[in-house]
Amino acid sequence: MFHMIVRKIFSLLSLVLSCAAMGQTITPEIEKRAVELVAQMTLEEKLAYIGGYNGFFIRPIPRLGIPEIRMADGPQGVRNDTHSTMYPCGIAAAATWNRELARTYGHSLGQDARARGVHIMLGPGVNIYRSPLCGRNYEYYGEDPFLTSETAVAYIEGMQAAGVMATIKHFCGNNQEWNRHNVSSDIDERTLHEIYLPAFRKAVQKARVGAVMSSYNPVNSIHTTESRELIIGVLRGKWNFKGIYMSDWTATYSTVGAANNGLDLEMSWGQFMNPDKLRVALATGTVTEETIDEKCRHIVQTLIAFGFFDREQRDWSIPEKNPVSSETALAVAREAVVLLKNDGDMLPFSRKIRNVVVMGPNATNIPTGGGSGFVMPFETVSVAEGIRNADKRIRMKVLAPELSVDLTARGGFFTPDGKPGLRGEFFANPKLEGNAVGTVDATAIDFFWQNAPMEGVPATQFSARWTGTFIPSVTGQAVFQISGDDGYRLYIDDREIIADWYDHFITMKRASVDVEAGKSYKVRLEYYNAWDSGTLRMCSACHSPILPQQEIESADAVIYCAGFDSSTEGENCDRPFSLPQQQLKEIAEAAMLNPNLIVVVNAGGGVDFTPIVDKARAVLMAWYPGQEGGRAIAEILTGRINPSGRLPITVERRAEDNPTFDSYRANVAQVYNSPLRVSYDEGVFVGYRGYDRAGTEPMYPFGYGLSYTTFDYANLKMERLDDGNVVVSFEVTNTGRFAGSEVAQLYVGDEVASVPRPEKELKGYEKVRLEPGETKSVEIRLSPDAFAFYDMNRHDFVVEPGDFTISVGASSRDIRLSEKIRID
């Protein structure tokens, strides 16, 4: 049934794509219309137009019929003051290795945007996974430029077919979050074009993406909002991009440099490209009005091409809570989960599995990455809920803190005069200054303010403070989780345990403190709203750190839900390679009590699996699987779904094994010096390319993933066509007892080259669904690009005549078929 639904969605999508594709082409007629409109704009209108306003908008010019344009973050759901479908994260989409599903994902997200009147979505993110430490790896599509490109193109085509402009980001070299505004990514020309730029190029040339967003970091010491070489030379020149080039939010660093070197639109507002500063530049001749006109034309012609001037963007026929979107989120989650270990066929659960313990920090939590990963879904399914619903014969015990917004539960919170809840004071300014306008008691901190929170307090630019005491019901750990936009911070006994005290969109932070049952702890929660609507939510729970031995020992299986979340992995910071020590301690203790341990890991990339794999009989990499993730994981555990996810990354045994380990961060001693630089010394040998060159055995190779069935490969054939393409065909057979999907991967290796080249590079793949005993023929067409490398003397890709090895297999280290071919 699931596969029928996905095929039906995709059939409709194919029709939409065929009808809508021409709408994204900037034709000479559209360019002429844009020129005429810009000619009618006053200088003041033009100077204001190239700076965003109200956070996520391009300003309207009503007298010319130029509409207000609404943008929304992000790649895995419509954010910004709305509930919406929370899809699996980007790296999960890549782990499906399914172009059709990526296209459906993009289209469903586009439909969600149309239901809310959003014109431009700020995604996908395609920065290459260079190291597991980068805090935003979860947003991206893995370590390989081909897989990243294929996934991104499909996603963009789907989204833009829905009538929503996609924005590919972050252009480019944004491969770490640590000190991202200041650290230069020093990348040689060949490495840029072979590894870090292909997804952007294909998005422009194949998917015809409407917008490109800059990165925060400099590349080769020049910020990408003012890099003439990258914007005008590569993006506009080599690739003939005619769309909008916008800055990331507060990623513009000068007026003249940005204006003269290709930036069209400064977001979220014109800090540097604003009328006051640009008038000075015009008066001194450092910027010309023609340069300003060109920016306005780029913006206007792109908006016209997408139909935004000629129709209402909100589609009232699409429900905001869309069951089709939920089904898409579930479909992606089902295919994204990677089965890493399954000793003794622990999975799927046999009929003997009747009593199950579910534990760990993510058992009842819906983990996401921080920043753009935080979407407010209408509904969610945790792993515990998923298992409860998947098989009614299974009796389940949950040993995990169940977070609640109810301030009167689990011991409870009390106002200063002893009433249940916390006492809130509201201030008519964002700094908690002066006397409170009013007070109100709350039994739950769960607010979404679209208007003033109380009389006498403005709708924006206000602050609030809640105070009281917390008396836990058990001795152990109290867990606090806060989500909100703009600033929030939490103090327990005057010690700050959570802080996100700056202007921002919705984020989520979590912290734990040791507590004693019956003891009173002072609580102070502070919040401010800077602009637009306000959101604040606090959940809490108490649990004992001592594992209940009898319950774990007597269970038929124990499922431990481990990993990171938005508090520990997200934007503007990097994260550790190791899982939190408390989790590793609990995993070890659970394994000693019960050998049937299954570990489910939530993370945006590789982690140190060494302390896990020796203790668990089964391990699943679930990424951040979105609102339906718990249901998908439960279906895989119980055998309703055969896992088909494959790693879009290489997972190292040790952090030191990663090819970038020695050069990932700038020298710490340089933190207070300028400039800060990270040299990409590994060159093109990132990911599996580097492991192959070094002869290092990874923990799990690129493309790896287990299934409940087995597959054989046979009959490799190759045919060279007159147009220079090569057609590779082979057969895949399901040799096991379960229906399942295999990801057949094709790698190309140059036998002799004038420059150092990787042993093999992914150049094709197909996901093939097979019934038990079924054989299918797979055909992959290779263009000359599959054999090329970037020549720094010619500043272009070249194919050197010679012998190449075509390898086909189940991962980069599991090659089943190979044969040489001569390319002249």
Please provide the spans of the model-predicted regions:
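Bacterial Sec-dependent N-terminal signal peptides
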Residues: 1-26
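Glycoside hydrolase catalytic-domain context in secreted enzymes
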Residues: 21-479, 483-792, 798-812, 822
